[in-house]
Amino acid sequence: SWASFATGKNPGKTTIFDFLKRDPKTYMPDFAMNSVSQQQVLWGKWTSVIIAPSIGVILFLIIFFSLYFSQCTRMTLLVSSIGGTVAVCGGLLFLIDRYLPQERPVVINNRQGKTIWELSAEHGIKTRVIRFPNTFPPDHIEDGEILSGLGVPDIRGTMGTFSYYTTEHTAQSENTEMGGKVIQVTWTRNKIETIIYGPRNKLFKRPPSEINLPLRLEIIHNEANHAEVTPPLPSLRKGGINGEETKGLANPSSSQGVEKGGISSSDLVSVSKSLSLTLHVETKKESQAIFPTSQEEVKNGLKSITSPPSQGRGGGVEDATVHPHPNPPPSMGRESDTLSEHILPAPGGRGIRGGGAEPVPGNNEDIRLLKIETSGQTQVLKEGEWSDWLVLKFTFNPFVKMYGIARFHVISIEPLKLYLSPINFHPERPPLPISYPEHYAADIAKKIGLYKTLGWAIDTWALNEERINEEIFLDDTNFTINKEIEMLKEFLGKQDARLYIQLFEFTDRIQHMFWRFREEDHPAYDREKAEKYKDVIFESYKKMDEIVGMVMEKLDDKTVLFVCSDHGFNSFKKAVNYNTWLVKNKYMTLTNEGDTKEKTLEDLFGRGQFWPNVDWDNTKAYALGLGDIYINLQGREAYGAVRPGKQYEKLRDEIKEKLEAWVDAENGQKPVRRVYKREEVYKGFDPNHVPDLIIANNNGYRVSWQTSLGGIPKDLLEDNKKNWSADHCSLDPEITKGIFLSNMKFDVAEANIMDIFPTILQLLNIPVPDDIDGKVLK
């Protein structure tokens, strides 16, 4: 939906209708927000052939005339000239072929439509956009800045690959469903030698396929004051990483913190991401900024914005509706000028910084510490402690290097349980542009220290796979958000842009992971943990409200503030395997029904094998992404089995009717609330691109992770025992409404998320384009 916010167009026009798309010629899934292509470096495979002989000719002439004027014999002249030239040319051919790539990856932003920040910049309005989704690579805006958000990958090219090192050999090894790496290790004389998984080698065709780093771990005892040993890092630029001599692996000023927002609460109004827009128009991402005490207060006190079937998938939605309140709620936190360090209160009344660690013994007691060495840096940590940022240098060859940053958390030393966060691009040396101007990401780092650049900054995947616990997750959430608050404060201190947009998604991430503590009948409910964490969602809203209050405190009467979300939330108790449903209802045929290998995100980003046992010639439909069904259409799909026209329409009607009538035999509920035909949801779409049917689930049901990746598990429905316990993806937008708040009165009965685009343009006196779908709010 954020693409629709940015352009005023429906997802059919922006082409961002899901996190995933598919290639009809190969049936292969891919990331929808951006695509990776290859760009030739110099002359590609001919570079060495062109450069070496060219230099050879010049060298030959230099040697020849040097010897000629020194009156050498003809034979000496000829042999020396040719010999020297051949030797140098041969060496150049070898060096260029070995150390200079023929191609390099380039990223293409797939979002279509001109954005609000491009239009504002064209009209001379200073604009700043912070961590907005689908801004990677960033747009070029004159006299403005963009820091890319959701869509920026980690150093492995994924949405966030964490690593988990353990001596417990009962743990699942290798790749988890959500893309984590589980590395089983063994102590040898209190030492472990292992690796940090780095970037895939997409520059050179020769091995290695991945550029990894050695990692050395050692148990040490009685380390006085448990001091950190940190040899100086090579500076990434003169003056160090933060403008000073860099002494460790991290920026000493790294703060804990608060990050992104956007979600909602079950029976309350929902939200997912909230933005602050200043217009000076400001949009700031929030989740339910205020907490009504009843459903009636929700209806009377907030504008509620709904999204259609694509909502919450990274695209906008067509049917989003808002029920406005004439006045901005008075409780938006004007009294708070300073923010508490932690967004969420810790269970038991203590801070969450420790990540759940037990109290540390006194200096006279025998304590075990973990010494971590990698990339020329050393840190010594207690159990329950986070490392500072480590700057990781991945060397492809002496001339090609890639820099990343990551943090360790020591969960346990014996047995070893060591978590390594996804490796972010270093903001001062990203391999691809993550800001506009390109130096803007580095400028921010100079002011606030190192920060996360990964689009999906809060690691929900590790908590979902139970490699970290809730307190570690909240600790990292605080760390993340505080940095983003610092970015916001940078603007509020100067207010040097007329249009400011920033996205906070921490409320979204928290609600995904903590909803299970609100429902005793949820398959993932844990009574003991619920006592600690049942209020975390509400605390995240309070923190977002505090952020909004801080913004309002700084605004004058002429500045307009918008706070909005792109979706709400519903419970996720059961996962629906739609490809399995298609198989059981004879719409998909398998060559081997026993082959139900689980798919992982590593398969997606690593270009693994998909659909290995599907008989496409006898398959009518297939499911992929977050509730999308594609018809195996002749002339569009590579092995199309369904004729366009009457057969196509009859099949869509049949699948729609059966899915909407389907009843869960276990409880009598309907998993599917509605199935939309694409023309009911989108306008101006590419029929080769957009799914033919969009499934909208009822509360409690969601498309399974396996269906999203093209998997075909055995069972139709599965209890969701994962920590990811609530969602908006594949839920019917009619029951998944978000919010829209403003300090400006609007006299409208309903609104659409696309309406914000033209409304802001009008406030900025910019002509509204004719080809958009949104309407100006009055």
At which residue positions do the language-model features occur?
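Substrate-binding rim/cap in mid-to-C-terminal beta-strand-loop elements of soluble/periplasmic
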Residues: 578, 582-645, 722-764
